Structures are given as C-alpha cells and as structure tokens.
From Swiss-Prot:
A Pfam family annotated for this UniProt entry: Dus
Binding positions (FMN): P33, M34, V35, Q87, K158, H186, N216, G217, D218, A240, R241
Entry keyword Flavoprotein: yes
Keyword tags: Flavoprotein, FMN, Oxidoreductase, tRNA processing
Free-text function comment from the UniProt entry: Catalyzes the synthesis of dihydrouridine, a modified base found in the D-loop of most tRNAs.
Name of the protein in question: tRNA-dihydrouridine(20a/20b) synthase [NAD(P)+]-like
Superkingdom: Eukaryota
SUPFAM superfamilies with a match to the protein in the record: FMN-linked oxidoreductases
Similarity annotation: Belongs to the Dus family. Dus4 subfamily.
E.C. no: 1.3.1.90
GO molecular function, one term: flavin adenine dinucleotide binding
Active site, per annotation: C116
Length: 317
C-alpha cells in the first residue's frame, strides 16, 4: 500500500464525512469503482472536473489482508485523494473487517461489492450473489462497525436488483438496520447487461429507505445525471463508462475537452501511470473526437513519447 504523505496528515484530510454531502440537497456526483481504471491518477483527473466522491477499483479483501504485494499494487492514494471509498470484494466478515482496519487511516470508508455480475466473482462468493445472502451482508457490515470505531468512517454497499423488487427492498432495509451508511443501486438484475436501466426500481428503493441512495447505470452526461437524480429522488449518481469516455462530464462538457486530455497526460506522467493504462484511458477519451483512421493510428502507438508526439502534432497539446 502506497501513500505520498504521512499517515497523520492523511487522517487530518479525511475528517470530512461524505454523508454531509448526501444531506446537502445537491446532486452528489460519484466516480464508480472500475477494475483497472478508477485508480489514483484517474481519480485525480475527475476530481478536477467536479467529481465529488471517488471509489477505488474493486479489491479482493482476502488477498489484500494476506499479501503485502497485493496491498502495494492495489491501493495507492495521496493527500488530495479525498473523499475516497475503498471497494472490497468479500464473503468473510473477519477478513473484510481486517481489510477495513488497514485502509481506515487512508480513506473515508469502505464499500462491499454486492453487484459485480462476472462469473469468476460470483463463483468465489463475491459480487452479485451477495444480494441473495442478506444475512451475510449484515454480518459483514456489523463486523466492520464493531472493529473500526473511527468517527465518520462509512460502510456502504453497491447492489444490483432482483426480479422481485420486494427482495431488494428487504435486503436494503436489513442493511440499513445493521448500520450501512448508504446504498448504491445499479438498476439491472445480475443477468441483465445492456437492457434499459430500471430507474423506476431505484426510485421505489429510495422511497423505502431513510439512508442515502445513489443511482447507477447508463449515465453519459451531466444532463442525464441530473435527470436520473430527479426521476429517482436519490441523493447522488454514480458513473463508470460515461466518465471513462469523458472525465470532464460532471463539469458539463459534452465531450472530452483538450484541456482534460492535457491534464491526463500531466497527471499520468507525474504519478508514473503504467503505459497500457495511460494509453487505454486516452483511447476512451478520444473516441468521439477522432476519425476511424485516426483511431487506427493512435491505438497502434507503442510508447509514451509517441503518444505525446501524436497529441502535439494533431492537437497542439
């Protein structure tokens, strides 16, 4: 686990409770947990463009607790990286609470992934299979609450919905009763992929909860974010692919501005972002502003210097 400043300094920076944002009455704009992508450099970028709260990529709690190598590779932060939620994949309350204790000085809270539909995750007892195990979810929340006594440290869950929405409402109410801080709802079932998001279901869940609820699914612009926020009555919206394509989305840009691309280059180079990640993010950002031929050329570039030369030649960056 890496940090660019002393633990005591980070603790001071983390004092603000994200819950306060949800109670402000304003739209809370959240960067989703994205495997490989929502790491420190990308979080730094989206924070420059009106993102209020960021999540780390999903981290397997068991590996994180047992392996120093996993901690060093999976979790990096710095003083400006807040408010921050660390998302864990877990199916064991003790291991999750151990992981939460490790990140507690460096983050504002942890989130339990109860929504990942990937086969490998569900086969391991992680992700979306947990929506069918409310007692296990409750146990994990309780254990973290008992083991981490830091004031304001949040414990949240991110879920998908059931075909029978009553089961989802029951899950959420049980989680709330156990002490969960807020719930993020992706408005699809575990079996659904590209079907329309059930925003009406998210609205019903919110109406049955006293804690904050975040809406998630198919939000590609600030206008869409504001619309989903209004129609669901939720406290915030979480965006994944929309931010990959346009990290400046929450600031109201319809497509990635050149300044954002330049900011990404600066941030990625400063933080030592691996080339593959650096390049992949640019491919997402430039999707809408490059022709098919330009994409072929840009996507084939194989070094940081080649990318910088390309951007300089084509965009004056």
């Amino acid at each position: 686990m890496k940090s660019d400043c002393m633990q005591t300094t980070i603790c001071q920076e983390r004092k603000k409770d994200p819950i306060e944002m949800f109670h402000s009455g304003q739209l809370v704009k959240v960067c989703a947990p994205m495997v490989r992508y929502s790491k420190l450099a990308f979080r730094t970028l989206v924070r420059k463009y009106s993102c209020d709260l960021c999540y780390t990529p999903m981290i397997v709690a068991a590996d994180f607790v047992k392996s120093i190598k996993a901690r060093d590779s999976e979790f990096t932060t710095n003083q400006g990286d807040c408010p921050l939620i660390v998302q864990f994949a877990a199916n064991d309350a003790r291991l999750l609470s151990d992981a939460a204790r490790i990140v507690c000085p460096y983050a504002n809270g942890i989130d339990i992934n109860c929504g990942c539909p990937q086969r490998w995750a569900m086969a391991e007892g992680y992700g979306a299979c947990l929506i069918n195990k409310p007692e296990l979810v409750q146990d994990m929340v309780k254990q973290v609450r008992n083991q981490v006594e830091t004031p304001g440290f949040s414990v949240s869950i991110k879920i998908r919905i059931h075909d029978d929405l009553k089961r989802t409402v029951d899950l959420c109410q049980k989680a709330e009763a156990t002490g969960v801080s807020w719930i993020t709802v992706h408005g699809r079932t575990a079996e659904e992929r590209h079907q329309p998001v059930h925003y009406d279901s998210i609205k019903i869940i919110k109406e049955n909860m006293s804690i904050p609820v975040i809406a998630n699914g198919d939000i590609r612009s600030l206008k869409e974010a504001e619309n989903v926020w209004r129609i669901t009555g939720t406290d915030g919206v979480m965006v994944a692919r929309g931010l990959l394509a346009n990290p400046a989305m929450f600031a109201g840009y319809e497509e990635t501005p050149l300044k954002c691309i330049w900011d990404w280059v600066d941030i990625a180079l400063e933080l030592g972002t691996p080339y593959m990640c650096f390049h992949q993010h640019l491919m997402y950002m430039m999707e809408k502003i490059t022709s098919r031929q330009e994409k072929r050329v840009f996507n084939a570039l194989s070094s940081t210097s080649a990318i910088i030369d390309y951007l300089t030649d084509h965009y004056g960056i």
